[in-house]
Amino acid sequence: MRKKLILVTIILLGAVLLSACAGGATRGMSWPGLATDGNLAYLSDGPFVFAVSLGDGRQVWKYPGERNNKLVFYAPPTVTPDGLIIVGSAGTDHSLIALNPNDINPDTNAPFEAWKFTGARDHWVAAPLVFENKLFAVNADGNLYVLDLQDSQSAKDATVVELNGGRLWAQPTTDGERVYITSLDHTVFAVDVNTNDVVWQKDLGGAVPGSAVLGADGMLYVGSLASQLEKFDPATGDHQTVLEAENWIWSTPGVDGDTLYFGDVAGNFSSFDTSTGKLNWKPVKPDAAITAGPLVREDHILVATESGSVFALDRDGKVLWTEAIGGKIYTTPVAAGDVTVVAPLETDFYLVALDANGRQVWTFTPEN
C-alpha cells in the first residue's frame, strides 16, 4: 500500500507542477479536465481544449488552432449561463480565457476569445465558479480572483482576495452567502460572496485537494488527506470529524439527498448518511485507488478507479456492472443525457462514452 500511495502522490501532486514548466506539453503529463453543456463535452488535455459532440464523439473544434508552447490545459472548463467556455492555463502563460463557441475562426476552426485575464501568478488547476454576475477563480498562487462577468471588457481585471492558502486546486463552492475554498495547505476558507472578506478559515491537519460540498442538512462537508470527513457549520466554521476513512480522501464527495458518496486512496467506496452520522453500508472495495469523484446518476452511482475501470453501484452498494476502459482514471466522469463521458489516461483514445448499462457508445481521438 505504501508504494501505491507514493505512486498516486507522484502522479497527482507532481504532474501539474511538471506541466507548468513544460512548454510544448503533450498528452499524458497530468489528468485532464472535463465538463459538458449537455450538447458538447469539453476536454482540457495538454496543449488543447477540445469540443466533442456527445452524439457521436466527433471533434467540433479545438483551441488554440495551432499549438502555443506557453499554454497547457488541465483545469476543467466552466460553462457560463450565456454559453462561454472558461478555462485556465497551467503553462508558462497563466491566462484565464473565455472562449466563445458561437464565434469560430474560419481559418483555424478555433473559437475566438471573448476575454482574457492575465493577472494570476501561477497555474490554473481548478474550474472557476460562476455565481450570479461574478466569477470566483482560485489559482495555485494562493489567491482568489473575483471577476465581473458583465463589464464587457476583453482584458479582465479582478478583485484579488489574498488567502495565503498555498496551492488552490479545487473549484469553490457557494451557498449564496459565502464562497468556500479548500487548499493543499490544509485550510478551508469562507469568503463573503458580496464583500469578498474572509469570514473564517480553519486548519484540517491534511491537504484538501477536493471541493467542499453542501449537504441536505445545510452543513458543509470536506474530505482531506488527513483521512477524515469533516462537517462544518457554514456560518461559523465550527467543525467536527464525522468519519475516519481508511486512507486519504482525495476527491469531492458526491451528494444525493442525505447521502454523501466518496472514495479513498486505499480503494474503499463509502456511503455516509448525514442525517444519522453513520455509514449506510460497509465500504465497497472495487479494484484500485479512487481519486476521481463519484458521479450520482438517476438509478446508480458511478465509481472510476486508478485501474481504468468504471463500476456502477446501486444505492445499497451492490455492483450492477463493471466496464474495463483501460489506462488510469483520475478525472471525475460527467453525465450528459443518456451517456456518461470518461477521460482516462494512458489510452489511445482521449474520451469514451458509456450508456446506462456500461456499454461503450463511442470513443474520441483528436484529429491530426
What is the predicted role of each segment?
Residues 1-19:
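Sec-dependent bacterial lipoprotein signal peptides
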Residues 21-30, 35-368:
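Extracytoplasmic/lumenal domain signature
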